[in-house]
A protein has these predicted regions:
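Intrinsically disordered, serine/threonine/proline
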Residues: 1-119, 312-314
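A generic structural signal for short, solvent-exposed coil/turn residues
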Residues: 17, 34, 109, 121, ...
Length: 314
C-alpha cells in the first residue's frame, strides 16, 4: 500500500464555525505497526500544532474521540474529521496553507506527508475541474506521458482557469486517481505551464482507495461519478444549509455531467471537452475551445465581489 495525503478544504461560516473535508492520510509502509504505538503530529506552515491523529493498523490516520455509551462508559470513536475547535487550533491563514503529517517510529524512523489545506469563506463560489481528460487530453495517457517528458495537456487550460480565478472564483480539482498517487499528481498540476501561465492553486481531491480499486472504477467500470458525487457532496455540506457553492464544472465524460447536475450546477455551466480539445457547453449544439471560453470570460464568468479576502485563492 502506498503512502499519500489528500488536500483539505476548510469553510468558515459567518458565525465563525469551521468545517473541513476529510483528513485522508495514509502511511502505507507502517501498516504493520499497532495504532496505539503511533501518534501523527500535525504541522501547519512549519509550526507544530497541538492537534494529533492516531495511526490504525491499516496505515490510515484518524482523529480519536471519547464517546459516551448508554451505560456512561467511555468509548473511542474514530473520525476523519476534526472539530471546529481543533481546526481553529491549526491557526490557518486565509487561502492556502501547507500541512505536514509526521510519524516518528523506532522501526521506520521519521516519515512526513505534505498536503495543502485551504481556508475559504462560506461566500466562495467554486468552479470544479476534473483532471484526467479535462486538463490532460486522456484519462489514462494523461497519467503517464507527462512523466515521460511529453506534453499531454489541452491547449488554453491554464489561461482560462487563470482568468476564472481573476474573476473572483475559487477552483478545486478532482481526480479518480488513488491517494498513493497524490505527490505525483500534485507535482504535475503545480508544474504545468502554458505560455507562462500556471494553473491557479486549489485543493486536489482524490480517491481514498488503493490504486487498483481506483483504476478499476475509472478505467474498467467507467464509473468515476460514484466517487465524485459523494466527494462533492461532502464539500457542499461544509457550507451553511441552503447555500449552493458550485458555480460551474469542467469534465470530459457524461458521468462528470451527471455528478455536476447532482450537485445543482446549471446545465449551461457544465463544460465537457473531448480528446481533440473541443468543448461542448451543455445545452448548446456548437462546440468551441478553452480559448473561446476565455474570450467570453466576462459573459460566462462575470466578476464577483471577493473583498472579504482578495488573496483567498493564494
Amino acid at each position: 500500500m502506498f503512502s499519500g495525503s489528500m488536500d483539505i478544504l476548510v469553510i468558515e461560516s459567518p458565525n465563525g464555525i469551521l468545517k473541513s473535508s476529510s483528513f485522508h492520510v495514509r502511511f502505507g509502509s507502517l501498516k504493520v505497526i499497532k495504532s496505539k504505538e503511533q501518534i501523527i503530529e500535525i504541522f501547519v506552515n512549519s509550526k507544530k500544532t497541538p492537534i494529533t491523529m492516531q495511526l490504525s493498523s491499516s496505515g490510515d490516520a484518524y482523529f480519536i474521540y471519547d464517546e459516551l455509551s448508554n451505560n456512561a462508559d467511555s468509548k473511542k470513536k474514530k473520525s476523519f474529521f476534526p472539530t471546529s475547535d481543533q481546526l481553529k487550533q491549526l491557526n490557518l491563514n486565509q487561502g492556502h496553507n501547507e500541512i505536514c503529517f509526521i510519524s516518528r517510529s523506532s522501526i521506520s524512523g521519521i516519515q512526513t506527508l505534505k498536503s495543502s489545506i485551504y481556508l475559504w469563506p462560506s461566500s466562495s463560489k467554486i468552479v470544479i475541474s476534473d483532471v484526467d481528460g479535462t486538463i490532460t487530453r486522456s484519462d489514462v495517457l494523461g497519467q503517464v506521458l507527462p512523466f515521460l517528458g511529453r506534453d499531454w495537456t489541452h491547449d488554453g487550460v491554464t489561461d482560462l482557469f487563470t482568468k476564472i480565478k481573476k474573476q473572483g472564483y475559487k477552483l478545486i480539482y478532482l481526480t479518480a486517481r488513488a491517494i498513493g498517487q497524490s505527490s505525483m499528481t500534485k507535482k504535475y498540476l503545480d508544474t504545468l505551464i502554458q505560455e507562462e501561465n500556471i494553473l491557479p492553486p486549489g485543493p486536489l481531491f482524490m480517491s481514498p482507495d488503493g490504486i487498483f480499486t481506483s483504476l478499476k472504477r475509472e478505467v474498467i467500470e467507467k464509473k468515476p461519478h460514484l466517487l465524485k458525487i459523494p466527494m462533492l457532496t461532502e464539500i457542499k455540506n461544509l457550507f451553511p444549509e441552503g447555500v449552493e457553492p458550485f458555480y460551474a464544472g469542467f469534465g470530459n465524460r457524461e458521468t462528470d455531467a451527471i455528478a455536476y447536475r447532482y450537485l445543482n450546477i446549471p446545465l449551461n455551466y457544465i463544460f465537457l471537452i473531448d480528446t481533440s480539445s473541443k468543448v461542448l457547453r451543455l445545452g448548446e449544439s456548437k462546440k468551441g475551445s478553452y480559448k473561446d471560453i476565455s474570450e467570453k470570460i466576462d459573459e460566462i464568468f462575470p466578476a464577483i465581489d471577493n473583498s472579504e479576502n482578495n488573496e483567498i485563492n493564494q
